């Protein structure tokens, strides 16, 4: 994929992929093809162009399902990115199930996108936001987990891979321990899906947000809805 980055037509070392990644030529070509040949709404028309777009959209959903090994394509919800996906969970699950006195646990490694929505939700609901710290090695301090993971914790938010440190967190262990007390787990997989094979069924996470950019996924364009979520 790196050789297909259009921006590499000049000497450049780009190390800010944690913030945003460059688009390879196949993505740009597919987007251009869409706008030039079959620009239309998805699931909003019965004419030819709309049918083409709808079929492509649903094929993209099936591709994502297979890629992250979700149990059903119905588990895949397209959003504009991991940030929107996390906010979607906060404003749906969070508003419906988080109550006064409940606790939400995140880690010290989280991107602001997996902190601020929970801060705002806790302010609205009178809930408590707790933070699992990391140690001098840049690893989560699991020795504090038993203290922080109380029966009041209703949701745990954890990054699969830190966007700053690159630490690969033991998310499967965290998910198992959270589930034992009845908490739901949201995994921010934005920095993991490009480098680690993802199997959401094996992880047993409740919600997962990811940003996907891979050649195999370009067979069908993601129209209007840009990124994938909800195993994103």
What are the language-model segments listed below?
Residues 1-4, 8-224, 232:
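Pyridoxal 5′-phosphate
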């Amino acid at each position: 994929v790196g050789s297909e980055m259009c921006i590499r037509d000049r000497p450049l070392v780009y190390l800010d992929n944690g913030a945003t990644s460059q688009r390879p030529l196949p993505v740009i070509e597919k987007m251009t093809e869409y706008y030039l040949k079959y620009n239309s709404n998805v699931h909003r028309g019965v004419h030819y162009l709309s049918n083409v777009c709808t079929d492509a959209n649903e094929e993209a959903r099936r591709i994502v399902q297979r890629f992250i090994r979700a149990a059903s394509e119905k588990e895949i919800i397209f959003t504009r990115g991991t940030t929107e996906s996390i906010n979607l969970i906060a404003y749906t699950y969070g508003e419906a199930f988080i109550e006064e006195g409940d606790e939400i646990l995140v880690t010290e490694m989280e991107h602001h996108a997996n902190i601020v929505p929970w801060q705002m939700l806790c302010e609205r609901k009178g809930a408590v936001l707790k933070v699992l710290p990391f140690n001098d090695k840049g690893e989560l301090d699991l020795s504090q987990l038993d203290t922080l993971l109380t029966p009041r914790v209703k949701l745990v938010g954890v990054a699969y891979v830190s966007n700053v440190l690159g630490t690969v967190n033991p998310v499967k262990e965290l998910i198992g321990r959270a589930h034992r007390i009845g908490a739901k787990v949201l995994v921010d997989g934005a920095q993991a899906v490009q480098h680690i094979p993802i199997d959401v069924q094996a992880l047993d996470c409740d919600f997962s947000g990811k940003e996907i950019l891979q050649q195999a996924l370009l067979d069908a364009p993601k129209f209007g809805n840009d990124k994938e979520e909800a195993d994103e």
